Curated annotation (Swiss-Prot):
It is found in: Mitochondrion inner membrane. Component of the cytochrome c oxidase (complex IV, CIV), a multisubunit enzyme composed of 14 subunits. The complex is composed of a catalytic core of 3 subunits MT-CO1, MT-CO2 and MT-CO3, encoded in the mitochondrial DNA, and 11 supernumerary subunits COX4I, COX5A, COX5B, COX6A, COX6B, COX6C, COX7A, COX7B, COX7C, COX8 and NDUFA4, which are encoded in the nuclear genome. The gene is Cox6c1. PANTHER family: CYTOCHROME C OXIDASE SUBUNIT 6C. One of its GO terms (cellular component) is mitochondrial inner membrane. Component of the cytochrome c oxidase, the last enzyme in the mitochondrial electron transport chain which drives oxidative phosphorylation. The respiratory chain contains 3 multisubunit complexes succinate dehydrogenase (complex II, CII), ubiquinol-cytochrome c oxidoreductase (cytochrome b-c1 complex, complex III, CIII) and cytochrome c oxidase (complex IV, CIV), that cooperate to transfer electrons derived from NADH and succinate to molecular oxygen, creating an electrochemical gradient over the inner membrane that drives transmembrane transport and the ATP synthase. Pathway: Energy metabolism; oxidative phosphorylation. It comes from Rattus norvegicus. It is a single-pass membrane protein. This is Cytochrome c oxidase subunit 6C-1.
Amino acid sequence: MSSGALLPKPQMHDPLSKRLWVHIVGAFIVDLGVAAAHKFGAAKPRKKAYADFYRNHDPMKDFDEMRKAGVFRSVK
């Protein structure tokens, strides 16, 4: 038996494309994770905060408070 038969041959054909494929798949998985984290960690809470604010918001009350504080000169 020769030592050449025991060692596996190195792959010489297209090693770059296999490496790129692994990195492309990895980048896609990371991208999906970041998108999900942004949606559930930032976008949904912000949307809920805006909805809660406008659900309980009374613009006439704010206007009357600003008018009484003297913010508007033309409104008496």
